[in-house]
Amino acid sequence: MLNMRKSHPLLKIINHSLIDLPAPSNISMWWNFGSLLGICLSLQIITGLFLAMHYTSDTLTAFSSVTHICRDVNYGWIIRYLHANGASMFFICLFLHVGRGMYYGSYNYLETWNIGVILLFTVMATAFMGYVLPWGQMSFWGATVITNLLSAIPYVGTSLVEWIWGGFSVDKATLTRFFAFHFILPFIITALVIVHLLFLHETGSNNPTGLNSNADKIPFHPYYTIKDMLGFIIMFLFLMILVLFSPDMLGDPDNYTPANPLNTPPHIKPEWYFLFAYAILRSIPNKLGGVLALILSILILILLPLLHTSAQRSLMFRPISQCLFWILVADLFTLTWIGGQPVEHPFIIIGQLASILYFLIILVLMPLAGILENKIMKV
């Protein structure tokens, strides 16, 4: 008789995805972030569900309800801070996961990569709407500034913004709909993750060399389940240190002041994981140009398969492209720093130079380096 996990209609799917899945024998810890993202998503959905039980999406009571969760609900403070800092862990894993895909040429799995980019946009939208819910100063003004960017769209812009707001300013209608979207989007993300995995399992995993590994595969369980467990432990360790010792380190102090439409904070800025895109947006004086640059800064990932000129898939044996990749990483750190700084000299010019360098490396220098490396290989 067949083993139940191999014969049962439901268990069979799980078995082929997590247990008997053939995996390359040489994948490194950089391949750990997919499963870490799954854990982060589960944590966010569970903590978010418990928060939603006590939260009220009304402008008069939203701020008080968050205070009530932290003060009066059993372990409400840890649920709230796990959710807030869990989002930061989610984005750290997400950026490392995308970086891994760029470094090792995983973008050549077109369907998997494109679904991944859609996932990135969806997660960013969800995080933005979640940031509005506590209804602090930065929540209110962040929502006002970011939604207002849509008014840069010619002809329909202003109507579109008012339609999203549900009125002539960010108010009760906006908060209610943002809460509804913030609640439903993680389930849409879960569905997209399943599609992402479905496409991945059509081709099998990439590996550090970028070569075909069909001749050398090992079962996912127990080898990579144990390896992933180590990643879970390290991530939870960092998350718990953050939550229990400095839960507000990554937040903004302005968000502990209730939203006040009559008083603008001196520096409006989003959460740290959006700062690189915010810096690119601010570096262009024109509103429409800034919005386009903001969208393109993420959408550029879709173009990576078209910009791949090298005969080799991975950067493992390509030193020139490696240098450019790490300059790009340093550039993203610079943009993140600039995004959190006030709009004044010298931050404006640094932001503009870093933004130009970001697009220049991806669109021009990396493809040229690929062509150059091909020529060197032939010599």
Curated annotation (Swiss-Prot):
Alphabetically ordered keywords of this record: Electron transport, Heme, Iron, Membrane, Metal-binding, Mitochondrion, Mitochondrion inner membrane, Respiratory chain, Transmembrane, Transmembrane helix, Transport, Ubiquinone
Q: Show the stretches that span the lipid bilayer.
A: 33-53, 77-98, 113-133, 178-198, 226-246, 288-308, 320-340, 347-367
Its membrane topology: Multi-pass membrane protein
> Which Pfam families would you find in this protein's record?
Cytochrom_B_C, Cytochrome_B
Main function: Component of the ubiquinol-cytochrome c reductase complex (complex III or cytochrome b-c1 complex) that is part of the mitochondrial respiratory chain. The b-c1 complex mediates electron transfer from ubiquinol to cytochrome c. Contributes to the generation of a proton gradient across the mitochondrial membrane that is then used for ATP synthesis.
Q: How does it assemble?
A: The cytochrome bc1 complex contains 11 subunits: 3 respiratory subunits (MT-CYB, CYC1 and UQCRFS1), 2 core proteins (UQCRC1 and UQCRC2) and 6 low-molecular weight proteins (UQCRH/QCR6, UQCRB/QCR7, UQCRQ/QCR8, UQCR10/QCR9, UQCR11/QCR10 and a cleavage product of UQCRFS1). This cytochrome bc1 complex then forms a dimer.
Additional note from the record: Heme 1 (or BL or b562) is low-potential and absorbs at about 562 nm, and heme 2 (or BH or b566) is high-potential and absorbs at about 566 nm.
| Name used for this protein in its record | Cytochrome b
